[in-house]
Curated annotation (Swiss-Prot):
Catalytic residue list: E46, H83
Assembly and interaction partners: Forms a complex with antitoxin YefM, in which the toxin is inactive. It has been described as being a YefM-YeoB(2) heterotrimer. Also described as a YefM(2)-YoeB heterotrimer. Binds the 50S ribosomal subunit.
Protein name per its UniProtKB record: Toxin YoeB
Result of altering Y84A: Loss of RNase activity
Keywords, in A-Z order: Endonuclease, Hydrolase, Nuclease, Repressor, RNA-binding, Toxin-antitoxin system, Transcription, Transcription regulation
GO terms for biological process, alphabetical: global gene silencing by mRNA cleavage; mRNA catabolic process; negative regulation of translational initiation; regulation of DNA-templated transcription; regulation of growth; response to heat; single-species biofilm formation
Assigned protein family: Belongs to the YoeB family.
Cysteine disulfide partners in this protein: none
EC category name: hydrolase
Gene Ontology CC annotation, any one: toxin-antitoxin complex
Physiological role: Toxic component of a type II toxin-antitoxin (TA) system. Its mode of function is controversial; it has been proposed to be an mRNA interferase but also an inhibitor of translation initiation. When overproduced in wild-type cells, inhibits bacterial growth and translation by cleavage of mRNA molecules while it has a weak effect on colony forming ability. Overproduction of Lon protease specifically activates YoeB-dependent mRNA cleavage, leading to lethality. YefM binds to the promoter region of the yefM-yeoB operon to repress transcription, YeoB acts as a corepressor. Shown in vitro to be an mRNA interferase that requires translation for substrate cleavage; if the mRNA is mutated so as to not be translatable it is no longer cleaved. Cleavage only occurs within translated regions. Has RNase activity and preferentially cleaves at the 3'-end of purine ribonucleotides.
Length: 84
């Protein structure tokens, strides 16, 4: 499964690399798990609604979420900082 980062999510990821390596590790674990089982597993995956319909979220921390969408052959990371 191909991994695609939005510009915003990549900026979020770079922010975490500079400020909190534990969160980077957690994001990497969630991405690995999401690639295997996109709609179940770690981080309490849940489908998003309304203007984010088609996207899913997983908990990174109580405050931050990994927001993503899955297609047949790719995983789009939309955000990995703050709530949706």
């Amino acid at each position: 499964m191909k991994l695609i980062w939005s510009e915003e999510s990549w900026d979020d990821y770079l922010y975490w690399q500079e400020t909190d390596k534990r969160i980077v590790k957690k994001i990497n674990e969630l991405i690995k798990d999401t690639r295997r089982t996109p709609f179940e597993g770690k981080g309490k995956p849940e489908p998003l609604k309304h203007n984010l319909s088609g996207f899913w979220s997983r908990r990174i921390t109580e405050e931050h979420r990994l927001v993503y969408a899955v297609t047949d052959d790719s995983l789009l990371i939309a955000a990995c900082r703050y709530h949706y």
